Design a protein with these regions (language model features):
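Periplasmic-binding protein-like
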Residues: 90-126, 156, 162-164
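Conserved functional loop/turn residues at catalytic and ligand-binding sites
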Residues: 6, 51, 65-66, 73, ...
Length: 168
């Protein structure tokens, strides 16, 4: 566990320890990797990155103290944050996450232009017949009207985009 207790202290710690501080990520080009690259650019430091084959192995090593910090999606980390297994400093979205309501945004914490948000998609192979894609879309719309599904999304700190931004 790092000594800082808030984002301001964390950024000061990173700057003071930039030559030895390490971060883990879910793989080169992953959201967690890009988030850390953007953060380092924003605060003007370079740290050593440790790539993993997914969030699971990275989270295991974060919990085991193999590296110092990590940026990842709330869908992957909310359980560990709520259980107190990891210390969270902020969310990178524009708005606070309802399931982590006491966690500030980086914007609130002084990084005014910093935002990282991710999205998840449902995919089918190229050439999937239109009736199958249409049925999949219709089933997804039905699922998104289910209060239990929406509550689970909220519990994980995520939610669907407005319908006008969806594609079949």
């Amino acid at each position: 566990t790092l000594p800082p207790s808030n984002v301001t202290e964390l950024l000061a710690w990173i700057r003071a320890n930039k030559d030895k501080a390490t971060y883990g990520h879910a793989g080169v080009g992953s959201a967690s990797h890009l988030c850390m690259l953007m953060l380092m650019k924003e605060i003007g430091v370079q740290m050593n990155g440790v790539p993993y084959r997914g969030t699971g192995p990275a989270m295991n090593d974060l919990l085991g103290g193999q590296f110092d910090l990590m940026c990842d999606q709330t869908t992957n980390t909310t359980g560990q944050i709520q259980s107190g297994k990891v210390k969270a400093y902020a969310v990178t979205s524009k708005k606070r996450v309802p399931s982590l309501k006491d966690l500030p945004t980086l914007h609130e914490s002084g990084l005014k232009d910093f935002e990282v948000s991710v999205w998840h998609g449902l995919y089918a192979p190229k050439g999937t017949p239109k009736p199958i894609v249409d049925q999949l879309s219709a089933s997804l719309r039905v699922a998104l009207k289910d209060p239990a599904v929406m509550q689970r999304f909220a519990d994980l700190g995520t939610g669907p985009e407005p319908a006008d931004r969806a594609t079949p």
